[in-house]
């Protein structure tokens, strides 16, 4: 049994999260992060996606959970960043599944080239930069890993602060 009370609490929270995701929609930022990982595993394991899979606009997907949890007082930026960094480590350590078919013939890589986009615009055309966008930039800086690949999407609506921070 785990004797470190902090680690024990983390493990218990992970177990509680598993009662929700992936069978149900996430209710918290942490659950949303876990769902991202499960979705990534499912796609890369089942679909053999030509060495690349983009989980999409992570900042856009996570912002509602981040805002709800920070407003409820159950999440701060330090914990939000830590959870992103844990996900980054998972992406980095996840080799792609065994290649088959044309993918086997054309590729000799062992990584799955996850690609994270941040910034850009929302589906309604508004500025898409949000608090999670900045956390993703912090994560990229802190982790300095070659995977997941990370892109910054810019538009005329992108704040100068975000552009400077991304560079």
Task: Cite the ranges covered by each PLM segment.
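Conserved catalytic cores of very large enzyme subunits
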Residues: 6-13, 17-167
């Amino acid at each position: 049994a785990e004797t470190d009370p902090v680690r024990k609490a983390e493990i218990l929270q992970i177990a509680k999260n598993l009662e929700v995701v992936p069978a149900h929609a996430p209710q918290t930022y942490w659950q949303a992060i876990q769902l991202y990982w499960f979705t990534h595993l499912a796609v890369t394991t089942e679909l053999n996606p030509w060495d690349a899979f983009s989980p999409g606009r992570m900042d856009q997907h996570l912002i509602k959970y981040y805002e709800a949890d920070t407003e409820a007082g159950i999440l701060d930026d330090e914990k939000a960043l830590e959870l992103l960094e844990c996900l980054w480590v998972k992406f980095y350590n996840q080799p792609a599944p065994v290649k088959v078919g044309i993918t086997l013939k054309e590729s000799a890589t062992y990584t799955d080239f996850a690609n994270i986009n941040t910034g850009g615009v929302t589906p309604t055309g508004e500025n898409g930069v949000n608090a999670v966008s900045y956390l993703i930039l912090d994560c990229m800086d802190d982790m300095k890993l070659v995977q997941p690949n990370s892109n910054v999407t810019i538009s005329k609506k992108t704040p100068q602060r975000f552009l400077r921070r991304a560079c």
